[in-house]
């Protein structure tokens, strides 16, 4: 099958969005599928073009006989204001749409959202070219941006809902990163429930497992708590800084690895509290990040205490588990059931510094549980969320859906 994938973020960019399809595309290629990726000129998360790229309209990369990456113009900026963020999204929507018009001879179109504007490309292209269109939903926009306070205007929110409705009406099927997203359709778009809805969570690839096995665990000299990834509005990392303050008298270090809009504020807060047990590290390449994860004693998976995040399943959780690290999850919802089933961590109350600190102290005082629950996590990931198995299931479901609608 020849797949046209449209996603704003793609490697060498980093983050959950880029990693999701970066991994799945490689697996599809190995399984004999042909993939064309349409994405932005890489600039995320720092807002500057990656080495080897520049401000240009389009760049085509023939990676292999079965993989072509087409990078379209993007407004590279630091997205530190609503105007810059909106401009970043809209510029790719228009450049991506114009670039997509030239592409042909593919069997199915997959568009990954958010940003929601990428879905507009899929809606228009699928209509013009009469191609089967699957929308990959990684997060619920505009609800999530409203919940985080990035959008406060009801008018803007309502416009976002109209855009969402337009895109949904244009799709032939859905790929859901979180199974719980189906409830969103039940509550708001019940007419869409007759379309195929295929679950594809962010699991762990064989490549990641191989890298995790490659490096022996060399633990830090002191007990180490690690958070890696986006330091943004959704994570509620202020509560982790408070937990570090509570635990100052213990020989416990906190490591924050990554970047994001809240990083500066978190550093400032740590400095004001005089925290000597908190360290911030920049974004790391995958291999270096795996080394840091394996060095840690425990890893954190926090989110803000918002009903919207009850459906969230952060991909970093499975990566921590694959590295044999127990996780402290500060989320209420679907994730807690996974942790209970896997017996691979503890559950703390979201945005509750005392609860997070108590969970950290549990592992500090029970080192044997670190080994036991770490092993449980590895076993769970291997048996339940291997990306190779997950994407094979999706492709079969997609092919069945296309066959049933062959007159499209």
Describe each model-derived feature in a short phrase:
Residues 94-101, 117-120, 124-128, 154-174:
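Membrane-proximal helix-turn-helix segments that form the acceptor-binding/catalytic region
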Residues 180, 200-203:
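Carbohydrate-associated surface elements
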Residues 217-235, 240-244, 255:
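Conserved donor-binding/catalytic core segment of Leloir-type glycosyltransferases
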Residues 222, 251, 255-258, 264-291:
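Nucleotide-activated donor-binding/catalytic signature segment of Leloir-type glycosyltransferases, i.e.
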Residues 298-301, 319-322, 326-330:
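Short hydrophobic beta-strand element within catalytic cores of glycosyltransferases
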Residues 341-342, 346-353, 362-368:
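Conserved acidic donor-binding segment of nucleotide-sugar-dependent glycosyltransferases
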Residues 355, 362, 369-383, 396:
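A short, well-ordered alpha-helix in the C-terminal region of glycosyltransferases
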């Amino acid at each position: 099958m020849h797949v046209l994938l449209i996603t704003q973020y793609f490697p060498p960019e980093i983050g959950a969005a880029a990693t999701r399809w970066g991994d799945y595309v490689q697996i599809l290629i190995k399984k004999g599928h042909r993939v064309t990726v349409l994405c932005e000129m890489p600039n995320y998360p720092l807002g500057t073009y990656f080495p080897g790229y520049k401000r240009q309209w389009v760049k085509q990369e023939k990676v292999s006989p079965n993989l072509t990456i087409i990078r379209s113009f993007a407004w590279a900026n630091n997205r530190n204001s609503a105007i810059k963020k909106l401009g970043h999204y809209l510029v790719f929507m228009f450049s991506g749409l114009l670039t997509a018009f030239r592409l042909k001879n593919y069997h199915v179109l997959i568009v990954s959202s958010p940003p929601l504007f990428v879905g507009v490309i899929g809606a228009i292209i699928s209509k013009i070219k009469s191609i089967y269109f699957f929308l990959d939903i990684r997060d619920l926009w505009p609800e999530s941006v409203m919940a985080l306070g990035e959008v406060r205007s009801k008018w803007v929110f309502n416009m976002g809902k109209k855009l969402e409705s337009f895109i949904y009406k244009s799709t032939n099927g859905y790929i859901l990163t979180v199974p719980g997203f189906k409830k969103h359709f039940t509550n708001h778009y019940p007419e869409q429930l007759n379309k195929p809805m295929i679950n594809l969570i962010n699991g762990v690839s064989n490549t990641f497992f191989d890298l995790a096995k490659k490096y022996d665990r060399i633990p830090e000299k002191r007990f180490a708590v690690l958070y890696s990834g986006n330091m943004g509005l959704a994570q509620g990392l202020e509560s982790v800084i408070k937990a570090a303050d509570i635990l100052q008298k213990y020989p416990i270090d906190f490591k924050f690895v990554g970047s994001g809009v809240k990083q500066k504020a978190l550093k400032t807060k740590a400095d004001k509290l005089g925290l000597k047990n908190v360290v911030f590290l920049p974004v790391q390449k995958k291999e270096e990040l795996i080394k840091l994860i394996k060095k840690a004693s425990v890893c954190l998976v926090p989110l803000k205490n918002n009903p919207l995040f009850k459906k969230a399943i952060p991909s970093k959780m499975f990566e921590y588990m694959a590295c044999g690290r127990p996780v402290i999850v500060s989320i209420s919802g679907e994730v807690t059931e996974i942790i209970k089933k896997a017996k691979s961590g503890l559950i703390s109350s979201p945005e509750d510094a005392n609860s997070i600190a108590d969970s950290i102290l549990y592992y500090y005082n029970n080192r044997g549980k670190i080994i036991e629950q770490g092993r449980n996590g590895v076993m769970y990931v291997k048996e339940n969320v291997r990306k190779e198995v997950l994407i094979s299931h999706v492709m079969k479901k997609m092919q069945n859906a296309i066959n049933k609608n062959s007159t499209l």
